[in-house]
Every structure is written in structure tokens, then in C-alpha cells.
């Protein structure tokens, strides 16, 4: 715990965006202002910090944002911040703008030295990623919206797969973690779920299962494939050649990061944002 008195906090979002980030920003800004703090927003993440894209934020700046996807502050990845020179520059900019406390919403790759270079006091961060792959937390902002977006898309793909008696491979996000694939696979009743955690899958076994399902008269076959597994398009070609069943691949891509956040994401993000300000004032860091 730090004895430092916090008067002005910096607010940014970093890495990939996630639905609910705006709800978190809104909660941080309004809670901080309500406790007498000044709030400076940084556009475009750490890159914006180095470029001094810094604005004063008021309650009006976050009005009508809780329902919006994306992040009103924009976001970016910044390799310069991984260097000592970049970190020293950032620290000098924070001092220049009087930023003595910090809040961010970040994904799985927050800057490892963030707490050491930025401020000697507290720097609470809320987990913001649709991949649900941040340690020490059971929930990350954006996951619920993303999994519902993917679930609805997969339902639609199954409809047309049934009409044409196809095998469909639907690729969801998850380079290193398969939570989206797992949840979607269970929710959509998929025949197969392929995740990075089990990357040594048996394609021959999938082919055999498809052939067995066709013998039983099944009219579709759904495979949920996390992006970390590999090229869904080539997988579809191989499976079609091996089974004779028309096979199509659908890559959901960045649509999973967009859209109006669900009730759960709005509530969790709001709670996390407000609590982060309390922790910051108390001099605590998560």
C-alpha cells in the first residue's frame, strides 16, 4: 500500500478491444470524479500516451456509452513501451500531466513493467479480453458478449448446413486459449470442439466420426475450431476429400469483438471499474 495521495488519474485501454470496455471507462470516470479526482483520458493506448494524446474527461464524455461496443478511447499495441527508453518517456509524460494514479483495461499481454515505470503508487487494471485467458480471475470483460455473438452465428450456420447436408467448420477467436470454442461448442451442441490446449487432435478420428454420422442419417456436422488450431479452410478441404461430404469453413473473425455488450458484461465492467478507483485511492494494485 502506498501513502501517496492520488489527485489525478490516467485512463486508457490497451491491446485488443472487448465489449464492455466503455462501461468500465464510464464507471471509472464517474466514480473518480465523484470522489474529487481529476481524470485524464489517453487515446490509442500506450502509443497515445507516448504521443501525448491526453484529454481531460468529464461525466458528459462518458454519457450514453454503457451500451456501446469497442472503446471510446480507442486502443493500440505499442512495442516502444517494451523498451527502457519508451518507459522513461512515458514516466516523464505522466509527470508532465500530473498523473499520479492509473487505471487501464488490458488483455492477456499487459506491459510487464507497467507498475514499475509508470507510477510509484497504485495502478489497478481491469481484465478486458474476449478470450477469458487472464490468470487470477474467473471473468474477463467482453467474454459473455463475444460468446453470445459467436453462438448466434453458429446457430445460423447450422441451419444452412442442415439444408445442404454439409459439414461446417466454424472458426472462433482464441489463439492460445480455447474458452470461446469450448463454450460455443457446448452451447451449440457441436459434434467436435478443437482447442489450442489440445492441439494434437486426431483428424482421422473426425473423418471416421463424420462417416459414421452420415450412415445414421445425420444431416449436418459442426466443428468448432479455435483460431490457434490452424487453417480452417485447408482443414475443410481435407475433410471433404476424405469423407465426400461437402464441407465449408466459416471464420467469424473480428465480429466477435464488436457489438453492444450484454447485461453481464455491462454490470461486471461497471463493478470492476468502480472498485478499481477505490483500490487506487487506497494505494492498492491488482
Protein language model annotation of sequence segments:
Residues 26-35, 55-61, 116-125, 141-145, ...:
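A glycine- and small-aliphatic-rich helix-loop capping segment at beta-alpha/alpha-beta transitions
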Residues 36, 40-42, 117-149, 194-198, ...:
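Short, acidic/small-residue loops that bind anionic groups at enzyme active sites
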Residues 101-107, 112-115, 143-246, 250:
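Accessory alpha-helical/coil subdomains and C-terminal extensions
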Amino acid at each position: 500500500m502506498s501513502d501517496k495521495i492520488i489527485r489525478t488519474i490516467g485512463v486508457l485501454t490497451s491491446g485488443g478491444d472487448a465489449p464492455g470496455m466503455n462501461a468500465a471507462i464510464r464507471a471509472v470516470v464517474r466514480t473518480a470524479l465523484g470522489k474529487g479526482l481529476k481524470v485524464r483520458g489517453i487515446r490509442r493506448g500506450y502509443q497515445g500516451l507516448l504521443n501525448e494524446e491526453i484529454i481531460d474527461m468529464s461525466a458528459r464524455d462518458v454519457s450514453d456509452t454503457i451500451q456501446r461496443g469497442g472503446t471510446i478511447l480507442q486502443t493500440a499495441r505499442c512495442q516502444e513501451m517494451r523498451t527502457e527508453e519508451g518507459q522513461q518517456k512515458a514516466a516523464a509524460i505522466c509527470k508532465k500531466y500530473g498523473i499520479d494514479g492509473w487505471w487501464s483495461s488490458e488483455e492477456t499481454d499487459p506491459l510487464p513493467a507497467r507498475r514499475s515505470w509508470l507510477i510509484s503508487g497504485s495502478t489497478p487494471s481491469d481484465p478486458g479480453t474476449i478470450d477469458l485467458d487472464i490468470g487470477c480471475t474467473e471473468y474477463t470483460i467482453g467474454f459473455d458478449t463475444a460468446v453470445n455473438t459467436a453462438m448466434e452465428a453458429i446457430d445460423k450456420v447450422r441451419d444452412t448446413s442442415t439444408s445442404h447436408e454439409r459439414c461446417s467448420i466454424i472458426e472462433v477467436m482464441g489463439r492460445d486459449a480455447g474458452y470461446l470454442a469450448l463454450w460455443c461448442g457446448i452451447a451449440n451442441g457441436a459434434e467436435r470442439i478443437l482447442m489450442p490446449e489440445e492441439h494434437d487432435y486426431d483428424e482421422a478420428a473426425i473423418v471416421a466420426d463424420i462417416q459414421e454420422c452420415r450412415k445414421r442419417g445425420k444431416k449436418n456436422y459442426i466443428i468448432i475450431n479455435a483460431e490457434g488450431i490452424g487453417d480452417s479452410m485447408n482443414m475443410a478441404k481435407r475433410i471433404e476429400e476424405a469423407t465426400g461430404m461437402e464441407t465449408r469453413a466459416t471464420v467469424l473473425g473480428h465480429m466477435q469483438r464488436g457489438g453492444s455488450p450484454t447485461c453481464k458484461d455491462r454490470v461486471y465492467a461497471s463493478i470492476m471499474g468502480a472498485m478499481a478507483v477505490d483500490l487506487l485511492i487506497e494505494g492498492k494494485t491488482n
